[in-house]
Amino acid sequence: ARLFRNYPHMELFSHVVGHIGRISDRDMAKLEEDELLANYRGTDHIGKQGLEQSYEKQLHGTTGFEQVETDAGGRAVRTLSRTPPISGNTLYLSIDSKLQALAIKAFGKYRGALVAIEPKTGEVLAFVSQPGFDPNLFVDGIDTANWEAYSNSPDKPLNNRALRGQYPPGSTFKPFMAMAALELNKRSPSYTISDPGYYTLPGSSHHYRDWKAGGHGSVDLHKSIVISCDTYYYGLAVDMGIDAIASF
């Protein structure tokens, strides 16, 4: 009997856990290069994506083997030696399964990515790329129909948007700008601006507008984050300069 991975949650963690698959010639060449080939057989499975791939060395364990004496007909007569296999390590994640499911439900029919992090520890609580896929289909080789359905889908379910997608950071960058301003003494918590709803560069009449027409009025550092005040950070960016911003 042989054991295979089963992914009972299917799409829920597909882009986090990834999947295993049949070992390929390319995998074998990489294992040989890393001096790990002796621990694998040509019929083994190996991590192909996600954490399955990243932690393959820790999860795989040690392959066992038997040395058997056979007769002229190839039938086993006796076992000369046996080395039992050693199970791989158990990997525990910080992902909150309920939060993960809630995040996926919130996306509904829409595509997108979401990563939720515990600020105090840096632990990843949710890691979502929508839509997902069924990793069970890849374990023993995905069939042509399912592969074409995934590959040709306009929703690109095999694309890990949370990991490989390139998106403008938008307002998620504002708290980091605020921390940089405090560290560089460019702003104090009590520093306040009067926001008319736009910002003009020195010597220019062009209006760089805030998301809220008419502005937010009096805005200090704390309020600038709470209401996501664009004009506050336009001015801060000018005062800090590109080199200081890039260092953060």
What is the predicted role of each segment?
Residues 89-90, 157-162, 188-190, 194-246:
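Conserved catalytic neighborhood of penicillin-recognizing serine enzymes
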Residues 75, 122-123:
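Residue-level signal for well-ordered, solvent-exposed loop/turn and beta-edge residues enriched
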Residues 4, 21, 98, 121, ...:
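Short, glycine-/Ser/Thr-/acidic-enriched flexible segments
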Residues 1-113, 128, 132-161, 166:
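Extracytoplasmic/periplasmic proteins that interact with beta-lactams or build/remodel peptidoglycan
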Residues 114-119:
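Short hydrophobic alpha-helical segments used for membrane anchoring or interfacial signaling
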Residues 12, 47, 51, 55, ...:
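Stable alpha-helical elements in mature extracytoplasmic
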Residues 16, 102-106, 121-122, 166-193, ...:
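Active-site SXXK
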Residues 126-129, 204:
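Short acidic, glycine/serine/threonine-rich loops at helix termini
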